[in-house]
Amino acid sequence: MKYYIYPCSSQKDAPYLIFSSGLGGHASFWNPQLESLSTHFNIVTYDQEGCHQDSALLPAHYHMCDMANQVLHLLEHLQIHEFHMIGHALGGIIGMELAKQLKSSSITMLSLTLINAWDELDAHTQKCFDARIALLASAGAEAYIRAQALFLYPPAWISQNHSHIKNTEDIQLQGFPPKTNVFARLKALMHFQLQ
């Protein structure tokens, strides 16, 4: 697993902040926030399992617990005993699952900030995921990636940021993971319910 540590620039004993990305799974999603937040925190970002072109295939019964375990193992490896966490969409759900697992651990999650996460999938999000799955299955990775902005952003923002979006999409296409991994991650995400 690839992970990245950005030490706090202003204090040696700063708290840790773990960033967890959405469905794309790449640590680089958080790059725009690193400069300002690393003045207050030691930041850790990571690439989620199965999100790279050369990734091993994920198991057939991949689950949110597996994604949370990845973070737990990272915390143990880095010997982080207390931390804050910010998760976007899937990353927030990983945080919720991790919080449940940490109840029986000596590691403490001090706070969890959720951005566009949910406790149970609603009908609109289900429809978006169904469309994305159909695109990937029927039309392939390029259609899946090129349509992604339509599910995420308002039209005016897309028009104003078209070049940036296209560059990002081109990069995503070059490193697109195995389809089965995308389907496994989507299935785990779609079946999550906070209990």
List the predicted regions and their residue ranges.
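Conserved HGGG/HGGXW glycine-rich cap/lid loop of the alpha/beta-hydrolase fold
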Residues: 2-57
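Structural signature of beta-strand start/N-cap positions in the alpha/beta core
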Residues: 16, 40-42, 81-84, 108-111
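Conserved alpha/beta-hydrolase "nucleophile elbow" surrounding the catalytic nucleophile
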Residues: 21, 83, 87-92
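Alpha-helical elements of Rossmann-like donor-binding domains used by nucleotide-donor carbohydrate transfer enzymes
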Residues: 29-32, 36, 66-73, 97, ...
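Active-site loop/oxyanion-hole signature of alpha/beta-hydrolase fold enzymes
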Residues: 35, 44-86, 97, 101
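Helix N-cap/coil-helix junction residues
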Residues: 80, 104-107, 194
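Flexible "cap/lid" loop of the alpha/beta hydrolase fold
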Residues: 96, 100, 109-139
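Conserved alpha/beta-hydrolase catalytic His-Asp/Glu region
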Residues: 123-125, 142-195
